[in-house]
Swiss-Prot record:
GO terms, biological process: defense response to bacterium
Tissue: Expressed in testis and to a lesser extent in epididymis (caput, corpus and cauda). Also weakly expressed in kidneys.
Protein name: Beta-defensin 13
Pfam families for this protein: Defensin_beta
Native species: Mus musculus
Keyword Signal in annotation: yes
Principal subcellular localization: secreted
Keyword entries, A-Z: Antibiotic, Antimicrobial, Defensin, Disulfide bond, Secreted, Signal
Secreted found in the keyword field: yes
Subcellular location: Secreted
A Gene Ontology term for the protein's cellular component: extracellular region
Reported function: Has antibacterial activity.
Stretch forming the signal peptide: 1-22
Length: 64
């Protein structure tokens, strides 16, 4: 019974870590595309309440 609870605890930890892998993968893709990840919404989208995060929305980096 103790082994079962340890397995369940391990699965819960893996489930919580899964979104972190997605974030790392998106950052890798954006770096590969020479851009930076942007998950912020435009001002007008926030006002009308239709803000959706585009996970692969990469824009070119601005050179200063």
């Amino acid at each position: 019974m103790r082994i079962f609870s340890l397995i369940v605890a391990g699965l819960v930890l893996l489930i919580q870590l899964y979104p972190a892998w997605g974030t790392l993968y998106r950052r890798f893709l954006c770096k590969k595309m020479n851009g930076q990840c942007e998950a912020e919404c435009f001002t007008f989208e926030q006002k009308i309440g239709t803000c959706q995060a585009n996970f692969l929305c990469c824009r070119k980096r601005k050179e200063h």
